[in-house]
């Protein structure tokens, strides 16, 4: 009986995992095509140059605790709390640091031979806005670990599809209204916000 239940859970997990990955690929491609028709390469360049800083910051604030929590043999409520507050605290510090460094990042690209049609002075406010995603993502790190650990594949698929759809529609709408790279930046932040809100909704340890 227990073996059949395990097989059933595994089959459902594989099914929802496939649905989530397939939907993410299809929706990501479709929304990407729409955005590409509305935005210029320079728009993508304005946001793209900031991604390396976001990637590094996210790697530092996570520090492997998410997967360690997900793979630990036994996890207590206090363990989730500890990881949650560590990630939030780290993200807040990193955001404050990057907020301060934003003008220097702008100056670096202004001095380099960076071929882009936009006024690079706009990189400072754009960077400070994009870096907000570091903090919002940290608020859902422990919750993601909970969903991963408890094999809630269906919920993860729903979260991915919903977050991608909402954030992409926001980005496309803003791009259509003429906000150019701000639409792309808002899409990224909106995705992390939607993810985090839904992680909290489906996680019961809080």
Residue spans for each PLM region:
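Helix-loop junctions and terminal segments of transmembrane helices
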Residues: 59-77, 148-149
């Amino acid at each position: 009986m227990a073996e059949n239940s395990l097989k059933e859970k595994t089959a459902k997990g594989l099914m929802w995992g496939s649905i989530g990955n397939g939907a993410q690929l299809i929706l990501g491609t479709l929304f990407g095509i729409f955005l590409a028709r509305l935005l210029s390469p320079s728009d993508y360049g304005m946001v793209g140059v900031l991604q390396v800083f976001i990637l590094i910051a996210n790697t530092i604030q996570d520090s492997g605790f998410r997967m360690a929590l997900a793979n630990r043999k036994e996890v207590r409520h206090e363990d989730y709390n500890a990881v949650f507050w560590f990630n939030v605290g780290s993200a807040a510090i990193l955001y404050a640091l990057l907020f301060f460094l934003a003008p220097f990042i702008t100056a670096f690209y202004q001095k380099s031979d960076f071929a882009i049609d936009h006024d690079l002075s706009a990189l400072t406010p754009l960077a400070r806005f994009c870096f907000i995603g570091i903090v919002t993502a940290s608020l859902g790190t422990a919750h993601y670990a909970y969903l991963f650990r408890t094999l809630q594949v269906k919920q993860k698929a729903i979260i991915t599809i919903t977050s991608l759809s909402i954030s992409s529609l926001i980005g496309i709408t803003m791009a259509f209204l003429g906000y150019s790279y701000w639409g792309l930046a808002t899409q990224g932040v909106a995705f992390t916000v939607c993810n985090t809100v839904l992680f909290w909704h489906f996680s019961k340890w809080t």
